[in-house]
From Swiss-Prot:
SUPFAM superfamilies: Thiamin diphosphate-binding fold (THDP-binding) (SSF52518), TK C-terminal domain-like (SSF52922). Belongs to the transketolase family. DXPS subfamily. It comes from Parabacteroides distasonis (strain ATCC 8503 / DSM 20701 / CIP 104284 / JCM 5825 / NCTC 11152). The keyword Metal-binding applies. This is 1-deoxy-D-xylulose-5-phosphate synthase. Mg(2+) binds at D152, N181. Its cofactor is Mg(2+); thiamine diphosphate. It is an enzyme of class 2 (transferase). GO terms for biological process: 1-deoxy-D-xylulose 5-phosphate biosynthetic process; isopentenyl diphosphate biosynthetic process, methylerythritol 4-phosphate pathway; terpenoid biosynthetic process; thiamine biosynthetic process. Binds 1 Mg(2+) ion per subunit. Thiamine diphosphate binds at H79, G120, H121, A122, G153, A154, N181, F293, E377. GO terms for cellular component: cytosol. Catalyzes the acyloin condensation reaction between C atoms 2 and 3 of pyruvate and glyceraldehyde 3-phosphate to yield 1-deoxy-D-xylulose-5-phosphate (DXP). Homodimer.
Length: 632
């Protein structure tokens, strides 16, 4: 009978309004039900498990207390929002999560009115929610609440602190919920903390606090200057009682907590107590990443996005073929260690992605020369610049889509000084199931105009090693290498590293009719496409250009003089990217071939598998083969 009760509660909730119709004593069962549903679905349909298991009680409490979607919930990053999706009309299609034409793995306003703001990159929630809260005040929507939910990891991002610093500058009733899951901030949850929350959230306390201030002002014992002194005294007293200085109240944000983020009934009480308080406020909750699934609780990093797993045994289902190609990420990690073994100046830097980019190899081999700086892409670049300025040779590894956040630092702090560092752009190109917020498709276009940069992309793992060596040994300025997520093409890649001449491409295949110019691993799709049309009466040349900047102008002159038809292929946006650079060269030098550019179109590409997205963009071997036939 207990199982039927669980199923009944789950089946009865389609939208938050259904949840709000339940009595509060049912909420614990709703949480257990929701947590199990997430585990059931993600065991077969991979996604971000740990973070969403940790926010089940918070999600239920938020939708129970607040009138969503009129009230706005802004999720930071969005990894923790799966429960939110299930409770807001997407339970029956949750199994399509991160699949092509299915629902997104992140909050997306185009998908649901309950998704108040786009999420994917960290640390934006406070600024976005503050803007929405101020807008509500300007529109006299005094009954609308705006809540930002941010994890302690995302709080390391500079944008979060910019939002905190500005939160009290304009009238707003913003509520910030800090989800502290022991990944960065560590405060204990005890009787004193809960007692302080009970006191500071009680209506009687806050009415007294307001009445005292109003009374002092009425009898002219308080003005704005004295008000600041009283606030400082209040904050100092609380700091004394808690034996800590409160950062948030230093920003004039009222602080409550920490509280147990897995006590749904207490969360409901606290949220009801503070939701109508005037001014910006922050509720600090303590949660456990992976809560309710023992393997995920015990290994938060491994179970952040574990892939398929056996929900009964807790074993991850990892299918690997014998002698399959290595991940580009592992090639980077092993190669960096090899280089570092021979030069003590080499250091590694990454903003919060040591496992994803395989900086962990460097951290294990040379812990004093490898740095995880947290979710702080701009800092990672400028920190690396400082290292380079003092004679170190940093390898700064940043995901391509996250490097967008450090653009000014690349220009101002690195390129202007022509500092010797290697910037490795991991996850370059289409990345698959994480979708539009994570596709690394803009880097070729946004880095190409910057003076002093060398920009390269390897065809395979062998050339990734060679380019890392080239950036280290053969160029004394900033050297950018972009490469994709996932497996490469080769089983035997541990070559003796060699310099790839800067600004020089390679002819992979000779031909007389059509010249195909590719850059990066997408060239392997070209190789397959040419094989598909080998029976056609067309002679196709294929060039692996390797370098976007500087271009191999000598080779391009030869191509411009010989071919009337050119196809460029890149795993990036075609506007402003590699194909555009080839077109500019041809126009500037008086060549007039017909140039067809293949790459990512002028659109934000959805989520799906790499083969599906390649086909969508016409970048897969079959689509390229069709274009070759069309050009014939």
């Amino acid at each position: 009978m207990a199982e039927s009760k669980v199923e009944h509660l789950l089946d009865s909730i389609h939208f938050p309004e259904d949840l709000r119709h339940l009595s509060q004593d049912k909420l614990e069962q709703v949480c257990a039900d929701l947590r199990q549903y997430i585990i059931d679905v993600l065991s077969e349909n991979p996604g971000h498990l740990g973070a969403s298991l940790g926010t089940v009680e918070l999600t239920v409490a938020l939708h129970y207390v607040f009138n969503t979607p009129y009230d706005r919930i802004v999720w930071d990053v969005g990894h923790q929002a799966y429960g939110h999706k299930i409770l807001t009309g997407r339970k029956d299609i949750f199994h399509t999560l991160r699949k092509f034409k299915g629902i997104s793995g992140f909050p997306n306003p185009a998908e649901s009115e309950y998704d108040a703001f786009i999420a994917g990159h960290a640390s934006n929630s406070i600024s976005a929610a503050m803007g929405m809260s101020v807008a509500s005040a300007l529109k006299k929507e005094l009954d609308r609440h705006v809540i930002a939910v941010i994890g302690d990891g995302a709080m390391t991002g500079g944008l979060a602190f910019e939002g905190l610093n500005n939160a009290s500058a304009n009238p707003n009733n913003l509520l910030i919920i800090l989800n502290d899951n022991d990944m960065a901030i560590d405060h204990s949850v005890g009787g004193l903390s809960q007692y302080l929350v009970d006191i500071t959230t009680s209506q009687a306390y806050n009415k007294m606090r307001y009445d005292v201030y109003r009374g002092l002002k009425k009898i002219k014992l308080i003005n704005n200057d004295r008000r600041e002194n009283i606030l400082r005294f209040n904050n100092s007293l609380k700091a004394l009682l808690t034996q800590q200085h409160n950062l948030f109240e230093g920003f004039s944000i009222r602080y409550f907590g920490p509280v147990d983020g897995h006590d749904v009934n207490y969360l409901v009480k606290v949220l009801n107590d503070i939701k109508d308080m005037q001014g910006p406020k922050l509720l600090h909750i303590k949660t456990k990443k992976g809560k309710g699934f023992k393997p995920a609780e015990e290994s938060a990093t491994e179970w952040h996005a574990p892939g398929k797993f056996n929900k009964e045994t807790g074993q991850r289902i990892i299918v690997r073929k014998l002698d399959e190609p290595q991940l580009y990420q592992d090639v980077f990690g092993h190669t960096l260690v090899e280089l570092a073994e021979n030069d003590e100046r080499i250091v590694g830097v990454t903003p919060a992605m040591p496992s994803g980019c395989s900086m962990t190899y460097m951290m294990k081999a040379f812990p004093d020369r490898a740095f995880d700086v947290g979710i702080a892409e701009g800092h990672s670049v400028t920190f690396s610049a400082g290292l380079a300025k003092e004679g170190m040779i940093p390898f700064c590894n940043v995901y391509s889509s996250f490097m967008q956040r450090a653009y000014d630092m690349v220009i101002h702090d690195v390129a202007l000084q022509k500092l010797h560092m290697v910037i490795c752009l991991d996850r370059a190109g289409l990345v698959g199931e994480d979708g539009a917020t994570h596709h690394g498709v803009f880097d070729l276009a946004y880095l190409r105009p910057i003076p002093n940069l060398v920009i390269a992309s390897p065809l395979n793992e062998l050339d990734l090693r060679n380019l890392m060596y080239t950036g280290y040994a053969a160029f004394d300025g900033p050297f950018v290498i972009r490469y994709p997520r996932g497996k490469g093409e080769m089983k035997d890649w541990r070559n003796e590293m060699q310099v790839l001449p800067i600004g020089k491409g390679k002819k992979l295949r000779d031909g007389d009719d059509i010249a195909v110019l590719s850059i990066g691993p997408i060239g392997n799709e070209v190789i397959k496409a040419i094989e598909m049309v080998k029976e056609e009466r067309v002679s196709i040349a294929h060039y692996d250009m390797i370098y976007l900047k500087p271009l191999d102008e000598e080779l391009l002159h030869e191509i411009g003089q010989k071919y009337n038809r050119i196809i460029t292929v890149e795993n990036g946006v075609i506007k402003g990217g590699f194909g555009s650079a080839v077109l500019e060269f041809m126009a500037d030098n008086g060549y007039t071939p017909h140039v067809k550019r293949i790459g990512v179109p002028d659109a934000f590409i959805e989520h799906g598998s790499i083969p599906e997205l390649y086909q969508l963009c016409g970048m897969d071997a079959e689509s390229i083969a069709k274009q070759l036939k069309k050009e014939n």
